[in-house]
Swiss-Prot record:
Protein's UniProt name: Glutathione transport system permease protein GsiC
Assigned keywords, A-Z: Cell inner membrane, Cell membrane, Membrane, Transmembrane, Transmembrane helix, Transport
InterPro entries for this protein: BPD_transp_1_N, MetI-like, MetI-like_sf
PANTHER family: DIPEPTIDE TRANSPORT SYSTEM PERMEASE PROTEIN DPPB-RELATED (PTHR43163), GLUTATHIONE TRANSPORT SYSTEM PERMEASE PROTEIN GSIC (PTHR43163:SF5)
Pfam families assigned: BPD_transp_1, BPD_transp_1_N
Gene3D superfamilies: MetI-like (1.10.3720.10)
TM ranges: 9-29, 103-123, 135-155, 169-189, 229-249, 278-298
């Protein structure tokens, strides 16, 4: 297992290098001139050229790329073109709100989704199954931005129960986490149901029932463990998507996180911040998938990695 983990970690190096090359080319193909945006609409050509020199944008593209890669290897992600602060500081100040929002969304989505999926599988083709799957389809179909605006209108504007802006207290997390986790809960419900339907028909489930074990214990002890392997895969993928895909939700709720920072950076063509954020999202996604693979062996001892 240790050798497998080490090999996967070493595989990060070429993957992140390829991602860094693609991201560098992508951001430099974005329409718009960062120097013009930073200098302002009233700046003349001389001022814009001076800003370009200060930002290093007057250098050849290959020289900019080498400067970017060599600094990144040393842990220096550069300076933000807009704030002139270190990119690492910009990301660090926004990371925790996004992480806590992701964890909050994932926790309730997994609990609700798995419970709905198990109930739907146990009472298959009956009203609990139909109700759970109807809610799940609705959760997948409803766009996140529309759900967010609906929740704001009802619970903040009309009822005045919950705040909409900021991340200072636990109340601020309720509406964004509901919005962000709705689709995940729906996916988890459908995936858990499909996995449990297969497990419930296995011989060991019938054997446990024949021994007089209660149905609740059969489902939770014998069914849950064996149905968890494909579900854990989906959990890992969804967590990665949540961590890097909260851009729309953070924009709707004006959330002070990485998604909002990325949107602002794209609008201002802040190349160093864009590059660093996408690299960070790629690293997070790869590490989450590694953790999921390791969890396979913990859930099912029959699985071993070499």
């Amino acid at each position: 297992m240790l050798n497998y983990v080490i090999k996967r970690l070493l595989g990060l190096i070429p993957t992140l290098f390829i991602v860094s090359v693609l991201v560098f080319l992508f951001v430099h193909m974005l329409p718009g001139d960062p120097a013009r945006l930073i200098a302002g609409p009233e700046a003349d050509a001389q001022v814009i050229e001076l800003v370009r020199q200060q930002l290093g944008l007057d250098q050849p593209l290959y020289h900019q790329f080498w400067h970017y890669i060599s600094n990144a290897v040393q842990g220096d992600l550069g300076l933000s073109m807009v704030s002139r602060r270190p990119v690492a500081d910009e990301i660090a100040s926004r990371f925790m709100p996004t992480l806590w929002l992701t964890i909050t969304s994932m926790v309730w989505a997994v609990i609700f989704g798995m419970a709905a999926g198990i109930i739907a599988a146990v009472w298959r083709n009956r009203w609990p199954d139909r109700l759970s799957m109807t809610i799940a389809v609705s959760g997948i179909s409803f766009p996140a931005f529309a759900l967010g605006m609906l929740l704001i209108q009802v619970f903040s504007v009309e009822l005045g129960w919950l705040p909409t802006v900021g991340a200072d207290s636990w109340q601020h997390y309720i509406l964004p986490s509901l919005t962000l986790g709705a689709a995940v809960a729906a996916v988890m419900a459908r995936f858990t149901r499909a996995s449990f339907v297969d497990v419930l028909s296995e011989d060991y489930m019938r054997t446990a029932r024949a021994k007089g074990v209660s149905e609740t214990w059969v489902v939770l002890k014998h069914g849950l463990r064996n149905a968890m392997i494909p579900v854990v895969t989906m959990m890992g993928l969804q967590f990665g998507f949540l961590l890097g895909g909260s851009i729309v939700v953070e924009k709707v709720f004006n959330w002070p996180g990485l998604g909002r920072l990325l949107v602002d950076s794209v609008e201002m063509r802040d190349y160093p911040v864009i590059q660093a954020e996408i690299l960070l999202f790629s690293l997070e996604f790869i590490l989450i998938n590694l953790v999921v693979d390791v969890l396979y062996a913990a859930i099912n001892p029959a699985i071993r990695y070499k």
